[in-house]
């Protein structure tokens, strides 16, 4: 199933006049296991570059950095054997780099402050890339295929796949079934308590 990332910030864009190397940041948390298939930075005139990071626990890894020119918006497609395979709960972080100076020929007048908006003279900050949602079984299968494709050996680090190093993971390790059962038990307990209270009345 196709998965869009909803990764960006259209409210807090504050680009100061006549200043280069300004940064914008946005985060999202993956609600399902995903295999990322594309990276598509979308900025406006001051945009110079965008980087995408994956954060899993205390592990932070840069997945992609790409230059940006608003005259030619590009989509970058990951090769199948390098596409990031990320577990549910991974934090995705994008950083946008802005140049609001005369050195940036796309900016009509760098003396002006710039905020958010849909016009080219205002700004957007979005990763429009997409991915594929993975079930628990598909997630484990994708990691095993990646290990075989790169001739993985114990101790090897796999860029963009924080759990690939654990070749003994099972569905129970990556599944939410235990959490769902616990939630169901809690709901049943609440219902039983309510029924008992009603009977006592």
What are the roles of these predicted feature ranges?
Residues 1-173:
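Beta-strand-centric surfaces of beta-sandwich/beta-rich domains
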Residues 179-200:
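Ser/Thr-rich, Pro/Gly/Ala-heavy low-complexity intrinsically disordered linkers and tails
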